[in-house]
């Protein structure tokens, strides 16, 4: 789960990380009063969306008068902001964060992530802040600094000190950076975060460190322990189909293709999407119904797939272990009768009660295209659309 910048900064401040502050606007009628309350020389108007690249897309504006700040804020509120992370459809701006501007002497990048490949928490930092870290990693990888934390020992003083020295800090800035590293690590652990990113982390004209922008991504599996974090969720920033799927206990991610996929197991789902690409088409979604799905969940999964108007065909690929193939077959038939499936439907079943499942489908009277293996299924659905 992601949260907005202003929410991320509020959490960081609770842990002792110095951040820039401002006022949040959630409706146009509040804009003028918010700017009057701020009453500063330089205003920074920021669109609050769950996507990066706001600055380049016009979602961050710096102005030097109250009147101009009000105009910029009114113009920005409610627009559809398109960045390299939103895709061409963009994201509607329903919230603004308006801050006082500050003089920047130097910008840095700092983040803490869970590195799955190394099975540990890793700090990533760079002297090249204020830009996409992916761009820095691609063009000048030598400017990326990484420190991994052994989960058996946790964060040690040498980690924090090493980061401070590698970034070139001196004197009181070393102490400030060490405190930021320790505070961010504590926030990461205690909130069950998957990533905390501060970009940029700046040195202001007084020579002090300040988080100018912040991003949190939380591990969804840990959210049940944090109702206070769940309360920060903004469903307007989420795909409605993904939200609907999550409420039904389904793992669904919308994509840009035309072939809907319903699979049990994340690995099999990835393999199914790969083979669809291999046969020349593009998947419309990732959808894992899970091992314990019942007839109603299968029916809901197909309804969600068909809610995507770009779907021109559906491939169901089920390996029955805990999941029984006859239950899948009954769910498919129930969905077809309930909502009507007007696009080609290819079904590949294997495993527990597979023959019973195939019999149920063949006796249903529905136009279902059977497939005996994954390659056959991919070939048939691509040909059918």
From Swiss-Prot:
Function of the protein = Succinyl-CoA synthetase functions in the citric acid cycle (TCA), coupling the hydrolysis of succinyl-CoA to the synthesis of either ATP or GTP and thus represents the only step of substrate-level phosphorylation in the TCA. The beta subunit provides nucleotide specificity of the enzyme and binds the substrate succinate, while the binding sites for coenzyme A and phosphate are found in the alpha subunit.
Question: Where do the annotations place substrate binding?
Answer: 264, 321-323
The cofactor binding remark recorded in the entry reads:
Binds 1 Mg(2+) ion per subunit.
Q: Which cofactor does it need?
A: Mg(2+)
The organism's superkingdom is given as Bacteria
List residues binding ATP: 46, 53-55, 99, 102, 107
Q: What is this protein called?
A: Succinate--CoA ligase [ADP-forming] subunit beta
Which keywords belong to this entry? ATP-binding, Ligase, Magnesium, Metal-binding, Nucleotide-binding, Tricarboxylic acid cycle
Keyword Amino-acid biosynthesis, does the record have it? Answer: no
Reaction(s) this enzyme catalyzes, per UniProt = succinate + ATP + CoA = succinyl-CoA + ADP + phosphate; GTP + succinate + CoA = succinyl-CoA + GDP + phosphate
Q: What is its EC number?
A: 6.2.1.5
């Amino acid at each position: 789960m992601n949260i907005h910048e202003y929410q991320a900064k509020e959490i960081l401040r609770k842990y002792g990380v110095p951040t820039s502050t401002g006022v949040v606007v959630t409706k146009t009628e509040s804009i003028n009063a918010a700017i009057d309350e701020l009453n500063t020389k330089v205003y920074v108007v920021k669109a609050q969306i769950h996507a990066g690249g706001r600055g380049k897309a016009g979602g961050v504006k710096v102005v030097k008068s109250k009147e101009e700040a009000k105009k910029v804020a009114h113009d920005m509120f409610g627009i559809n902001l398109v960045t390299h992370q939103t895709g061409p459809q963009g994201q509607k701006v329903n919230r603004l964060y308006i801050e006082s501007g500050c003089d920047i002497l130097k910008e840095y990048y700092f983040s803490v992530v869970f590195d799955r490949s190394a099975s540990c928490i890793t700090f990533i930092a760079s002297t090249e802040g204020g830009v996409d870290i992916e761009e820095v990693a691609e063009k000048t990888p030598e400017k990326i600094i990484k420190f991994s934390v052994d989960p058996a020992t946790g964060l040690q003083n040498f980690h924090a000190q090493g980061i401070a020295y590698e970034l070139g800090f001196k004197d009181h800035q070393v102490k400030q950076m060490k405190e930021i590293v320790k505070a961010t690590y504590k926030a990461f652990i205690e909130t069950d975060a998957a990533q905390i990113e501060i970009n940029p982390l700046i040195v202001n004209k007084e020579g002090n460190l300040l988080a100018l922008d912040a991003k949190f991504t939380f591990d969804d599996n840990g959210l049940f322990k944090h109702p206070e974090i769940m309360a920060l969720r903004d469903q307007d920033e989420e795909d409605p189909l993904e939200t609907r799927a999550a409420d039904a206990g389904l793992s669904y991610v919308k994509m840009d293709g035309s072939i809907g996929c319903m699979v049990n197991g994340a690995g099999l789902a990835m393999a199914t999407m790969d083979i669809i690409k291999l046969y020349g088409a593009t998947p419309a979604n990732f959808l894992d119904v899970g091992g314990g799905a019942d007839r109603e969940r299968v029916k809901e999964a197909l309804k969600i797939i068909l809610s995507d108007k770009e779907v021109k065909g559906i491939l169901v690929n089920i390996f029955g272990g805990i999941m029984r193939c006859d239950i899948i077959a009954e769910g498919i038939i129930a969905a077809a009768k309930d909502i009507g499936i007007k696009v080609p439907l290819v079904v590949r079943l294997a495993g527990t009660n597979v023959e019973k499942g195939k019999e149920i489908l063949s006796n249903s009277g529905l136009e279902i295209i059977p497939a005996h293996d994954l390659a056959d299924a991919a070939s048939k659905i691509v040909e059918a659309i």
